Amino acid sequence: SPLSQKQGYTHKLIVPHAVRLEAGRAYIEETAERIDRGGEGTLNTEGAIAKYVSTEAGNAAADAAIQALGGYGYTHEYMVEKIKRDVRITTIYEGTSEIMEMTISRDRWQQHLKSSGGYYRDQATELEALDQRLPQVGAGIAALAHRALAELMEVARIGRLTRNQHVLLRLGELVAITECSAALARRAARAADGVLPAKADRRFDPAALAAVSRVNARTTAL
């Protein structure tokens, strides 16, 4: 049987990257819609999350593509090595991934403090309501990730752990993937309801997009 039918190949080198890229796409499109509607400011943190998740996912996907092709992936003829170089720079220009992590964590840390820990708990409650209506889109698992993030931030507050820069960077990463899990669940719900925007990407049908969202939510919650 071809490699494309072997889980050791697809589930390591293809599926995780396709899923994370779709999460980034969902967050980008959701943020773009919010900007178009106006009234929420520049959404700088959301922009940082969109760039961070999408560029890191693209870089990981390109690296996996080289691995998937074996020796051929490393040669000029197959162009994959060029794709890797091209996508690698996206994690550097217009703000490195580390700057994005710091930008994200600082803003969301302030939101956590201002809301007395309610910022992500409130979002989790909304996702749980969505899960009651459309359990297939993975919103319940995304809600679990949001509650876990809220608890983690509270532990960091009590222990004053954010005095350590490494902790802030790690929080930025966790915030980004957690918020993207919610965006993808909402996108899958809109697809199931048949109300995606006219210009939205439709490479996945509603059932497939729901499956993608569930996989992403479970990976995030872990």
Describe the predicted segments one by one.
Residues 1-222:
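Alpha-helical interface subdomain recognition
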